[in-house]
Amino acid sequence: MSTSDAAATVIPIDDVPRQHGKAPAVDTVTAAPPPLAAAAPPAATTAPRKTRVPFFRRADRGSRCVALLDLVLRVAAFGPALAAAIATGTSDETLSVFTQFFQFHARFDDFPALLFFMVANAIAAGYLVLSLPFSAVVVLRPQAIGLRHLLLICDLIIAALLTAAAAAAAAIVDLAHSGNQRANWVPICMQFHGFCQRTSGAVVASFLAVLVLLFLVILAAFTIRKRC
């Protein structure tokens, strides 16, 4: 048996021969996904604080005070106007002479001026009540100039109406107290005391309401001029 000097090729049994023309298989290891970051805690939501708005702020403190005074004066004017209307409407008086068959009546509706006076005071009292909500709105919103203009115009109309009615009633009451010698009109208050007392008190109360309304007009005009 011949031996050669060439080294013998040793093929290990455990090795797997590479496939011809194919890339070697590479074991792919799937990388584990990175751990999810811990969820951030929700941001603390702070509810907006309710800031208290003072009723009398420095910017509109004067306007609110004037508007509040306007509301109080309307309530003050309502009383005399209503009292004048009620006193005039209930001023009827009957005078009996000798027997019940001869009676003399003094009624306010016999005088057109007193009838106009009672109606005007009733209208003024109703207007003052209806104007209270509008005046309250002006207290809450002093910048409502349009509403102030509306109240000013209505106050002027009611003041003019009430002034005319009170002046006419004052002339009739003076005639009832003093009479007129040139016209041979005798005074009737010597006989009808209740009628004259009620109508005289009604005239005084009506003039008080007129003064309050005139003060309201002056106050509103001054406020509007100041804000404009």
UniProtKB/Swiss-Prot annotation:
<keyword id="KW-0472">Membrane</keyword>
<feature type="topological domain" description="Cytoplasmic">
    <location>
        <begin position="223"/>
        <end position="228"/>
    </location>
</feature>
<keyword id="KW-1003">Cell membrane</keyword>
<feature type="topological domain" description="Extracellular">
    <location>
        <begin position="171"/>
        <end position="201"/>
    </location>
</feature>
<dbReference type="InterPro" id="IPR006459">
    <property type="entry name" value="CASP/CASPL"/>
</dbReference>
<protein>
    <recommendedName>
        <fullName>Casparian strip membrane protein 2</fullName>
    </recommendedName>
</protein>
<feature type="transmembrane region" description="Helical">
    <location>
        <begin position="150"/>
        <end position="170"/>
    </location>
</feature>
<feature type="transmembrane region" description="Helical">
    <location>
        <begin position="66"/>
        <end position="86"/>
    </location>
</feature>
<feature type="topological domain" description="Cytoplasmic">
    <location>
        <begin position="135"/>
        <end position="149"/>
    </location>
</feature>
<feature type="transmembrane region" description="Helical">
    <location>
        <begin position="114"/>
        <end position="134"/>
    </location>
</feature>
<dbReference type="Pfam" id="PF04535">
    <property type="entry name" value="CASP_dom"/>
</dbReference>
<comment type="similarity">
    <text>Belongs to the Casparian strip membrane proteins (CASP) family.</text>
</comment>
<dbReference type="InterPro" id="IPR044173">
    <property type="entry name" value="CASPL"/>
</dbReference>
<feature type="topological domain" description="Cytoplasmic">
    <location>
        <begin position="1"/>
        <end position="65"/>
    </location>
</feature>
<comment type="subunit">
    <text>Homodimer and heterodimers.</text>
</comment>
<keyword id="KW-1133">Transmembrane helix</keyword>
<feature type="topological domain" description="Extracellular">
    <location>
        <begin position="87"/>
        <end position="113"/>
    </location>
</feature>
<keyword id="KW-0812">Transmembrane</keyword>
<dbReference type="GO" id="GO:0071555">
    <property type="term" value="P:cell wall organization"/>
</dbReference>
<dbReference type="InterPro" id="IPR006702">
    <property type="entry name" value="CASP_dom"/>
</dbReference>
<feature type="transmembrane region" description="Helical">
    <location>
        <begin position="202"/>
        <end position="222"/>
    </location>
</feature>
<comment type="function">
    <text>Regulates membrane-cell wall junctions and localized cell wall deposition. Required for establishment of the Casparian strip membrane domain (CSD) and the subsequent formation of Casparian strips, a cell wall modification of the root endodermis that determines an apoplastic barrier between the intraorganismal apoplasm and the extraorganismal apoplasm and prevents lateral diffusion.</text>
</comment>
<keyword id="KW-0961">Cell wall biogenesis/degradation</keyword>
<dbReference type="GO" id="GO:0005886">
    <property type="term" value="C:plasma membrane"/>
</dbReference>
